[in-house]
Design a protein with these regions (language model features):
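Phosphate/adenylate-binding glycine loop and adjacent helical scaffold
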Residues: 44
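Canonical Radical SAM [4Fe-4S] cluster-binding loop centered on the CxxxCxxC motif
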Residues: 1-22
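Short, well-ordered amphipathic alpha-helical segments that serve as non-catalytic structural scaffolds
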Residues: 26-30, 168
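Glycine-rich anion/phosphate-binding loops
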Residues: 22-26, 125-126
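Conserved AdoMet/S-adenosylmethionine-binding subsite of the radical SAM
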Residues: 54-169
């Protein structure tokens, strides 16, 4: 509903990711340029058009990023904005525990609302499953939510009701 990139038109298997090496090379060049220009980043953030934790080499990409950050701009933080759908994977969990800001999204306590708002691709997606996986971080995460009212595909969507907010807070 609210992603500036729109709905994901691709389906599993149709995704394309930059290679680990390309990410490292481009990040290194960018960080070197920023440091040379005396404008080092405050934060290196993984987010955007797709889910970063779905990258097949996500753990290694995070390792490379932390190494480059430590070498070139040690004051910068590393952040990941995630829809939390991959946090059940051990490699993703390990990587997210290494970043400074592990930001995981959960927009409702109700599966039906999440399906309308976020259109998760997995038929097995459940809020309960996501919450259980979040508990494994032992508080080492930031919970991100967007409360909104609107319409999607002719269907009302509202996670600002008393019922929604009360359930989310539990």
């Amino acid at each position: 509903i609210y992603c500036e990139c729109g709905w994901n038109a691709e389906h599993p298997g149709g995704r394309r990711f930059n290679s680990r090496e390309d990410v490292r090379t481009q990040l290194e060049a960018t960080l070197r340029r920023m440091v040379a220009d005396s404008t080092p980043p405050d934060v290196i953030t993984f987010a955007g058009n797709g889910e970063p934790t779905m990258h097949p080499d996500f753990e290694a990409v995070i390792g490379d990023t932390i190494a480059l950050r430590d070498a070139l701009c040690p004051a910068a933080k590393v952040s990941v904005l995630s829809n939390a759908t991959q946090i059940h994977r051990d490699s993703v969990r390990r990587a997210l525990l290494r970043v400074d800001n592990n930001i995981l999204k959960l927009d409702s306590a109700f599966d039906a609302t999440v399906r309308r708002m976020n259109n998760p691709q997995s038929a097995s997606y459940t809020v309960r499953g996501i919450v259980e996986a979040m508990k494994r971080f032992d508080g080492r995460m930031i919970l991100q939510t967007m409360f909104l009212r609107g319409e999607c595909g002719g269907q009302p969507v509202d996670n600002t009701t008393e019922e929604e907010v009360s359930a989310w807070l539990r």
